[in-house]
Swiss-Prot record:
Protein's UniProt name: tRNA(Met) cytidine acetate ligase
Protein EC: 6.3.4.-
UniProt source species: Streptococcus pneumoniae serotype 2 (strain D39 / NCTC 7466)
Binding site residues for ATP: 7-20, 96, 152, 175
PANTHER family per the UniProt record, alphabetical: TRNA(MET) CYTIDINE ACETATE LIGASE
Gene name of the encoded protein: tmcAL
Entries under Gene3D superfamilies matching the protein: HUPs (3.40.50.620)
GO terms assigned for molecular function: ATP binding; ligase activity, forming carbon-nitrogen bonds; tRNA binding
SUPFAM superfamilies, per the entry: Nucleotidylyl transferase
Taxonomic lineage from the root: Bacteria, Bacillati, Bacillota, Bacilli, Lactobacillales
Amino acid sequence: MTITGIIAEFNPFHNGHKYLLDQAEGLKIVAMSGNFMQRGEPAIVDKWTRAQMALENGADLVVELPFLVSVQAADFFGQGSVDILDRLGIDSLAFGTEEVLDYQKIADLYTEKGAEMEKFVKNLPDSLSYPQKTQAMWKEFAGLDFSGNTPNHVLALAYAKAVAGRNIKLHPIQRQGAGYHSVNKDVDFASATALRQHQKDQDFLERFMPSVALFEQASKVIWEDYFPLLRYQILSNPDLTTIYQVNQEMAVRIKEAIKTAQSVEELVELVTTKRYTKARVRRLLTYILMQARESDLPEAIHVLGFTEKGRQHLKSLKGQVSLVSRIGKEPWDAMTQKVDQIYQLGKPSIAEQNFGRVPIRIETN
């Protein structure tokens, strides 16, 4: 049987995600971001709620991406996620993308010329942002042109790089309906961005979300809920360069901007430059909020939930892969667990995220 991996945030889970799971084949394993997202934002609803939504709509097994995998630029995010799915035995990786290309061919190209391609990126001027450098590399070596704003396509290329040289087939699925950043309401499939923006519009949610009741009952947070905490962390830290990935230039810009910024959005606007994209700045602010330091990734994989089919698969991995299903005295990943505690500060009503939590079990398949 095919074992398909899917890398996801489900922020929140919508009909487009359900479509992706429906199109994927065989046993479906999802590696999902925890409570903070790849572009440096808190998840609108917590990881357990999102895992439950996925399991109710076609996923067989949901595991959590550690914080230092989930909040990263596309390449590291892709690499770390594929590493985890590879250990769980996937032979195919399904993903949504705006452009359906021969991603397999691109992966093969990277297998063959990876070193040369990375050298090309290293030699590009530092005035370019990392995404611009990556795009220049794909243009040079694969003749790819980037049309406007297509984050899923950028991630898809990161996945192609990550599976290079591994025994994993790529299964691109054309994105249906609204674009990633679209807030349009008159479409067949709404984007997660639109759902976050129209979260109080019940008719809209019911049209585009399969597990709408779960979403409506859950505590919801936005970046602004953490702004006072972020401000405190910036003001009370004499040397921001001790924080993961924060360099001197960024430390100075952030310290200056916090004097006048009245919101996270304003802070991001003030700090962003041509070279440092908004997503990168949001990631740095997330690292500062968490006081993140460089640390090793956890050996074990944290299981958030499974169906009967998923449980059987986990059983077959026993002894080969280190799995954590209950977090007790021994931490699974100290960094991610600290992040979860800070996430809970966003709203007093958010449930405990780790201690005493056990994987969600969905009995029917």
